[in-house]
């Protein structure tokens, strides 16, 4: 990210554990520790105040703060960004790591014997609110506050999942949110890079031994199929320290490997491509100015 005379500032969302043990290892917790060890100032964000306060005991007091907030609540999340900017005067990176899995069953097997008029309740879509809306909210807030950095711009790295590409049948809604995140990132990346000097990319972990994964599932997996958190941290570092201008990249973190995933080729060539090429009058009508993309249709 170039040279800096002041420590860089990162917001790490999803920094608290989902278990009763507030310091049980998780991607957000380990990411916060890793960034602090490299000299970053880190704003840790999570829903659990007690877990956040416990986390701070394991971080440098002069470089880490905790902010209790729900990323699916725009006002709460915006308040965090505002407080961080007022505290440190800049936001260089958003690590959008908050995430949960399905909290209800879409398959409703327990309702097989219900009468036709006994309609099941709506599914709990908290997973959509946190995993997808939280990323969209965080991205918009990052755009706003990174415009006010001493050198405008910054980095956004999102924790996705390999389930976005190869869906897990146990968690269909979770995998749907992660697939949506991938396409959202690819959709906004060119404009953020060109107009805002912001790069947005995604890391996709496989099975990581964290609180979001049931311990019984970990026990049922052979060791070579487990991805160490350290591999995910390498993925984050790849994007946070990139000097080549990567944007819209999707990076699988699998065991000890980092693997890039690319967009498929258009099935019907230029006809398929034309359907998703920016038409400038529509872009201006939707967003207030032209995109300026090199392949846009005037």
UniProtKB/Swiss-Prot annotation:
EC number per UniProt: 1.1.99.-
Any GO MF annotation of the entry: oxidoreductase activity
UniProt binding sites for NADP(+): 27, 70, 97, 174, 178, 208, 210
Group of enzyme by EC: oxidoreductase
PROSITE patterns given in the database record: ADH_SHORT
Superkingdom field: Eukaryota
Transmembrane spans: none
Function: Short-chain dehydrogenase/reductase; part of the gene cluster that mediates the biosynthesis of PR-toxin, a bicyclic sesquiterpene belonging to the eremophilane class and acting as a mycotoxin. The first step of the pathway is catalyzed by the aristolochene synthase which performs the cyclization of trans,trans-farnesyl diphosphate (FPP) to the bicyclic sesquiterpene aristolochene. Following the formation of aristolochene, the non-oxygenated aristolochene is converted to the trioxygenated intermediate eremofortin B, via 7-epi-neopetasone.
Name assigned to this protein: Short-chain dehydrogenase/reductase prx6
Organism: Penicillium rubens (strain ATCC 28089 / DSM 1075 / NRRL 1951 / Wisconsin 54-1255) (Penicillium chrysogenum)
């Amino acid at each position: 990210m170039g040279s800096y005379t002041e420590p860089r500032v990162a917001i790490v969302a999803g920094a608290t554990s989902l278990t009763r043990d507030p310091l049980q290892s998780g991607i957000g917790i380990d990411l916060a520790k890793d960034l602090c060890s490299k000299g970053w100032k880190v704003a840790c964000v999570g829903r659990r105040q007690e877990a956040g306060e416990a986390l701070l005991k394991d971080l440098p007091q002069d470089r880490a703060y905790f902010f209790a907030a729900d990323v699916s609540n725009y006002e709460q999340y915006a308040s965090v960004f505002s407080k961080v900017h007022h505290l440190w005067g800049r936001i260089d990176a958003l690590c959008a790591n908050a995430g949960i899995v399905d909290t209800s069953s879409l398959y409703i097997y327990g309702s097989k014997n219900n009468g036709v008029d006994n309609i099941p309740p709506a599914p709990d879509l908290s997973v959509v609110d946190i995993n997808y809306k939280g990323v969209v909210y965080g991205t918009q807030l990052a755009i706003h506050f990174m415009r006010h950095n001493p050198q405008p711009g910054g980095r956004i790295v999102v924790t996705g999942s390999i389930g976005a590409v190869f869906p897990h049948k146990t968690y269909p809604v979770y995998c749907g949110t992660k697939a949506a995140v991938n396409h959202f990132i690819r959709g906004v990346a060119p404009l953020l890079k060109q107009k805002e000097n912001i790069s947005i990319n995604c890391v996709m972990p496989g099975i990581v031994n964290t609180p979001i994964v049931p311990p019984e599932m970990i026990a049922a997996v052979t060791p070579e199929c487990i991805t160490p958190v350290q591999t995910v941290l390498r993925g984050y570092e790849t994007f946070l320290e990139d000097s080549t201008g990567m944007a819209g990249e999707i990076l699988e973190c699998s065991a000890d490997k980092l693997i890039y995933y690319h967009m498929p080729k258009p099935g019907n060539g230029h006809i398929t491509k034309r359907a998703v090429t920016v038409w400038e009058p529509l872009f201006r009508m939707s967003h207030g100015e032209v995109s300026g993309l090199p392949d846009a249709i005037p």
